[in-house]
Regions:
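Active-site/catalytic core of tyrosine-dependent DNA strand-transfer enzymes
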Residues: 160-206
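Short, contiguous acidic/charged loop-to-helix segments that flank catalytic cores in large enzymes
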Residues: 71, 86-88, 144-154, 180-187, ...
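Conserved tyrosine-mediated DNA breakage-rejoining catalytic core shared by Y-recombinases
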Residues: 112-169
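DNA/chromatin major-groove-contacting recognition/catalytic segments
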Residues: 81-85, 136-143, 224, 245, ...
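Basic, Lys/Arg- and aromatic-enriched nucleic-acid-binding interface segment
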Residues: 26-30, 34, 49-55, 59-113, ...
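C-terminal catalytic core of tyrosine-transesterase DNA break-rejoin enzymes
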Residues: 31, 49, 98, 102-109, ...
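N-terminal core-binding DNA-recognition domain of tyrosine site-specific recombinases/integrases
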Residues: 1-52, 68, 186-191, 206-209
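Catalytic-site neighborhood detector that most strongly recognizes the C-terminal catalytic loop/helix
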Residues: 69, 73, 131, 164, ...
Length: 266
């Protein structure tokens, strides 16, 4: 503890920002780094109070700037084009794109989803796993499956009844335990992202990341009048405040539409 200095802490924070993600080797998000700084501040303050270390002013450490990325989602016309392209595609694995559009699943949750996670009678799916691309003990690329990073990410999502017949047919043909499978082969996150990118290129739709499917689901849900608490639970957010903050523009547009309808009574 005596060797710990503000300079060492600052270097540590820089390392976290540049290569702190042990899964990807890339930097941690600014919000994640700032959370770590808060824990450090609390721990070091307590150590000082207990006489275990000298006082270190963590509050003087330069923090990474946080900025809310604009929410990217597809228009209704683009969504329809994507759906038609998926339904005309002979590869069953592509149906996962539609499943994301109507459940808000993250790509890792989608690829980790097994047939045993779907209750066809109740028309709902259980999210209890996620996956990401990593390396095995020999340094070879592989897909790693684990538990979601938060308890709120573990959830049960109702499936629109219109999707059930499609899922039943795909299950009959499937030789994989995964809903999005390719026989005995495991589909990596990157390869599925690439399949989605190629679909967008073929349809001449402006490129958005795979996460835009989740944002599109949230946007459509708001447009249909879903309340923020229900949407938050379906998305697996820790609390409705996160949902409201992220989709504040969509909620405002929804309010404006209702107010304009009300104005027509004049």
């Amino acid at each position: 503890m005596e060797e710990l200095t503000p300079i060492i802490l600052q270097r540590y924070i820089v390392d976290l920002s540049q290569k702190g993600n042990t899964k990807t080797g890339k930097g941690l998000a600014p919000n994640s780094v700032n959370c770590i700084i808060l824990v450090l501040h609390s721990s070091l303050s307590m150590a000082y109070v207990l006489g275990l270390s000298k006082e270190i002013h963590v509050d003087k450490i330069k923090r990474p700037k946080t900025s809310e990325k604009p929410v990217e989602s597809f228009t209704k016309e683009e969504q329809k084009m994507i759906e038609q392209a998926v339904l005309s595609d002979k590869r069953d694995k592509m149906f996962g794109i539609i499943l994301c559009l109507y459940t808000g699943l993250r790509i890792g949750e989608l690829l980790a989803l097994e047939w045993s996670d779907i209750d066809f009678t109740k028309a709902e799916l259980s999210v209890s796993k996620t996956c990401y691309d990593g390396q095995d003990e020999n340094g070879k690329s592989c897909r790693i499956t684990g538990t979601p990073k938060t308890e709120s990410s573990k959830r049960v999502i109702p499936i629109p009844k219109q999707l059930i017949p499609h899922l039943r047919e795909i299950k009959k043909r499937s030789a994989s335990k995964y809903v999005v499978g390719n026989g005995s082969k495991i589909i990596t996150v990157r390869s599925y992202q690439r399949s989605f990118e190629l679909l967008l290129q073929k349809q001449k739709i402006s490129h958005h990341g795979f996460h835009a499917l989740r944002h599109t689901f949230a946007t459509r849900a708001i447009e249909c009048g879903m309340d923020v608490k229900s949407l938050s639970e379906i998305l697996g957010h820790k609390n409705p405040t996160i949902t409201l903050k992220r989709y504040v523009h969509s909620f405002m547009e929804h309010k404006r539409e209702f107010m304009n309808r009300l104005g027509k009574l004049l």
